[in-house]
C-alpha cells in the first residue's frame, strides 16, 4: 500500500513539473516587443500585422521553393523514363500478333477478338 502511494505521489510530481515547464506558445522577442508596444500605441497593431504577414509569406515562399525542387526531381525522373521508353521503341520492330479465327478474350465484361 505505501509503495502505491509513493508511485502516485511521484507520478503527480512528474505531471506537475511537466505542466510548469511547458509553455503555451513559443517565445519570440520581436513579437513580445510588438505586443508590449501595442498596449501603448494603437499604430503598432498595424506593425504587428505587417510583421506576422511578412513572416507568413516568407514561410509560404520557402515551402513553395521546396515543392518546386521536388517537382524538378520528378520531371527529371519522368524525362529519364521517357528516354528509356524511346530506346525500347527503337529496338527491333516486332510484327503484330496474328489472331486466330474465332479466338475471343474476356475483357471488361465483354468478349473481344484476339
Curated annotation (Swiss-Prot):
<dbReference type="InterPro" id="IPR018142">
    <property type="entry name" value="Somatostatin/Cortistatin_C"/>
</dbReference>
<feature type="propeptide">
    <location>
        <begin position="25"/>
        <end position="98"/>
    </location>
</feature>
<feature type="signal peptide">
    <location>
        <begin position="1"/>
        <end position="24"/>
    </location>
</feature>
<keyword id="KW-1015">Disulfide bond</keyword>
<dbReference type="GO" id="GO:0005179">
    <property type="term" value="F:hormone activity"/>
</dbReference>
<comment type="function">
    <text>Somatostatin inhibits the release of somatotropin.</text>
</comment>
<dbReference type="Pfam" id="PF03002">
    <property type="entry name" value="Somatostatin"/>
</dbReference>
<keyword id="KW-0964">Secreted</keyword>
<dbReference type="GO" id="GO:0005615">
    <property type="term" value="C:extracellular space"/>
</dbReference>
<keyword id="KW-0165">Cleavage on pair of basic residues</keyword>
<keyword id="KW-0732">Signal</keyword>
<keyword id="KW-0372">Hormone</keyword>
<dbReference type="GO" id="GO:0030334">
    <property type="term" value="P:regulation of cell migration"/>
</dbReference>
<protein>
    <recommendedName>
        <fullName>Somatostatin-1</fullName>
    </recommendedName>
</protein>
<comment type="similarity">
    <text>Belongs to the somatostatin family.</text>
</comment>
<dbReference type="InterPro" id="IPR004250">
    <property type="entry name" value="Somatostatin"/>
</dbReference>
<feature type="disulfide bond">
    <location>
        <begin position="103"/>
        <end position="114"/>
    </location>
</feature>
Amino acid at each position: 500500500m505505501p509503495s502505491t502511494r509513493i508511485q502516485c505521489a511521484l507520478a503527480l510530481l512528474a505531471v506537475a513539473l511537466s505542466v510548469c515547464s511547458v509553455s503555451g506558445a513559443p517565445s519570440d522577442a520581436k513579437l513580445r516587443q510588438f505586443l508590449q508596444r501595442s498596449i501603448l500605441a494603437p499604430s503598432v497593431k498595424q506593425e504587428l500585422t505587417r510583421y506576422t504577414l511578412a513572416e507568413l509569406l516568407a514561410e509560404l515562399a520557402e515551402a513553395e521553393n521546396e515543392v518546386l525542387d521536388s517537382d524538378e526531381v520528378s520531371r527529371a525522373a519522368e524525362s529519364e523514363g521517357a528516354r528509356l521508353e524511346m530506346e525500347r521503341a527503337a529496338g527491333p520492330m516486332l510484327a503484330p500478333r496474328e489472331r486466330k479465327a474465332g479466338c475471343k478474350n474476356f475483357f471488361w465484361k465483354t468478349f473481344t477478338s484476339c
